[in-house]
Swiss-Prot record:
Gene3D superfamilies in the record: Winged helix-like DNA-binding domain superfamily/Winged helix DNA-binding domain
Gene source species: Yersinia enterocolitica serotype O:8 / biotype 1B (strain NCTC 13174 / 8081)
Positions contributing to iron-sulfur cluster binding: 56, 61, 64, 71
Protein name: Probable [Fe-S]-dependent transcriptional repressor
GO molecular function list: DNA binding; iron ion binding; iron-sulfur cluster binding
Family according to the record: Belongs to the FeoC family.
Any Pfam family the entry gives: FeoC
Job of this protein: May function as a transcriptional regulator that controls feoABC expression.
Gene from which the chain derives: feoC
Disulfide bonds listed in the record: none
Keyword entries, A-Z: DNA-binding, Iron, Iron-sulfur, Metal-binding, Repressor, Transcription, Transcription regulation
InterPro entries xref list: FeoC, Tscrpt_reg_HTH_FeoC, WH-like_DNA-bd_sf, WH_DNA-bd_sf
């Protein structure tokens, strides 16, 4: 099982990633990955970014029942510390 550090490192290596990508990459259950992402976000190590679905070819992702579950609208990346 991956640790918080391994999850953070996986995000760092890819630049940004969504929970599904990380779940598959680290062979971890999605609910566990989501909980770990929330923890890293609360710790200030990563940031949660909601993507705009306006780039969808049909423009209907926001109202499509399948789109709400299958279109990834949230990605995570390392937080810039200035």
């Amino acid at each position: 099982m991956a640790s918080l550090v391994q999850l953070r490192d996986a995000i760092a290596l890819s630049g940004s990633a969504d929970a599904n990508q990380l779940s598959h990459q680290l062979a971890m259950p999605l609910p566990l990955v989501e909980a770990m992402l929330e923890k890293l976000t609360a710790m200030g190590k990563i940031e949660r970014i909601e993507q705009d679905n306006s780039g969808c070819l049909t423009g209907s992702c926001k109202s499509c029942p399948e789109g709400k579950n299958q279109c990834s609208t949230v990605i995570y990346q390392l937080k810039n510390h200035r």
